[in-house]
Curated annotation (Swiss-Prot):
Originating organism: Sparus aurata
Site (Important for FDH activity and activation by fatty acids) location in chain: 117
Lineage of producing organism: Eukaryota, Metazoa, Chordata, Craniata, Vertebrata
Protein localization: Cytoplasm
Binding site for Zn(2+) 1: 47, 69, 176
NCBIfam families hit by this protein: adh_III_F_hyde
Protein name per its UniProtKB record: Alcohol dehydrogenase class-3
């Protein structure tokens, strides 16, 4: 492409400081260095994790920054030494990379590649620099992806090449929310046929958990949320019954234990609230119940329960990106979507032009959207 090797000026949503709306700015995006890829984005989702960092609650939050981590686009140019991508490839950036070489990648028990973890947490690319500038200032990267920009640069291990026929305004969501919830049920909990599951929080991740539980053959899938408007939607994804904690005077874990003859086989916390994490564990059946933490809690918050809960056979687990080894799994998830094995379209409640990004955040905070997709 004629832009290869040159700085590209484009639109991006810059977070200048925590707690303030994003600002649409013209930014400069430098060409990719060795083992980096520059991408032209076509669509990006708006996720709670972006809002969490923007709020100032994230201990790793840095400003100014270009947020966003649910994107899809095409390769514009590649840096030196990049062999797996070429200009024009359809790609999804990955906030959990897969180098294939570190001890984490070589261990089948985890998907948490550590190759670039330190620099990613510092808002930089692996060579400890940023490719973004705005108004003469360096702007930080976010989660190694920064999809709230028309162009972004990512490490070549933080990218999946996917089916070029896939609609980018849908499959961008496989970069985070849907994959996270779906994999939590299939990979982390390994939900068994005939089981009873409880899902706390019926946003995009919770709905994806429900979808995973259904695919795994669970017979009872109980959705728990304070917003009854979400129940009808959850039913479409496979939930069989619902509980609104506001309708009960006793703690939610007691309600669930009574409903399920001693507790659920699997529970999932999709909110990021440490009190709910405890309730989700204590709603599990003695002897074999498993609770999976997916939600991200605020900086410095801690979980607690009585050790007896664990001594008597309950298991507490956590998961990131649904346990999927990203580079190899995301293309397969796209194929599952293309062959109608995986719902994605149903998660998209709003599609807005990129300039209306702050409206996307407002819809999410108001509980009016499952996922808003922004198109460039």
């Amino acid at each position: 492409m004629e832009t290869a090797g040159k700085v590209i000026k484009c639109k991006a949503a810059v977070a200048w400081e925590p707690g303030k709306p994003l600002s649409i700015e013209e930014v400069e995006v430098a060409p990719p260095n060795a083992h980096e890829v520059r991408i032209k984005l076509f669509a990006t989702g708006v996720c709670h994790t972006d809002a969490y960092t923007l709020s100032g609650s994230d201990p790793e939050g840095l400003f100014p920054v270009i947020l966003g981590h649910e994107g899809a686009g095409t390769v514009e140019s590649v840096g030196e030494g990049v062999t797996k991508f070429k200009p024009g490839d359809t790609v999804i950036p990955l906030y959990v990379p897969q180098c294939g070489e570190c001890k984490f990648c070589k261990n089948p028990k985890t998907n948490l590649c550590q190759k670039i973890r330190i620099t990613q947490g510092q808002g930089l690319l692996p060579d400890k620099t940023s490719r973004f500038t705005c108004k003469g200032k360096q702007v930080f990267h976010f989660m190694g992806t920064s999809t709230f920009s028309e162009y972004t640069v990512v490490a070549d291990i933080s990218l999946a090449k996917v089916n070029e026929k896939a609609p980018m305004d849908k499959v961008c969501l496989l970069g985070c929310g849907i994959s996270t919830g779906y994999g939590a049920a299939l990979n982390t909990a390994k939900v068994e046929p005939g089981s009873t599951c409880a899902v706390f929080g019926l946003g995009a991740v919770g709905l994806a958990v429900i979808m995973g539980c259904k695919v795994a053959g669970a017979t009872r899938i109980i959705g728990i949320d304070l917003n009854p408007a979400k129940f009808e939607t959850a039913k479409e994804f496979g939930a069989t019954e619902f509980v609104n904690p506001k309708d009960h005077s006793k703690p939610i874990q007691e309600v669930l234990v009574e409903m399920t003859d001693g507790g659920v086989d699997y529970s999932f916390e999709c909110i990021g609230n440490v009190q709910i994490m405890r309730a989700a564990l204590e709603a599990c059946h003695k002897g074999w119940g498993e609770s999976v933490i997916i939600g991200v809690a605020g900086a410095g918050q801690e979980i607690s329960t009585r050790p007896f809960q664990l001594v008597t056979g309950r298991v507490w687990k956590g998961t990131a990106f649904g346990g999927w080894k990203s580079v190899e799994s995301v293309p397969k998830l796209v194929e599952d979507y293309m062959s109608k094995k995986l719902k994605v379209d149903e998660f998209v409640t709003h599609t807005l032009p990129f300039e209306k990004i702050n409206e996307g955040f407002e819809l999410m905070h108001a509980g009016k959207s499952i996922r808003t997709v922004l198109t460039f």
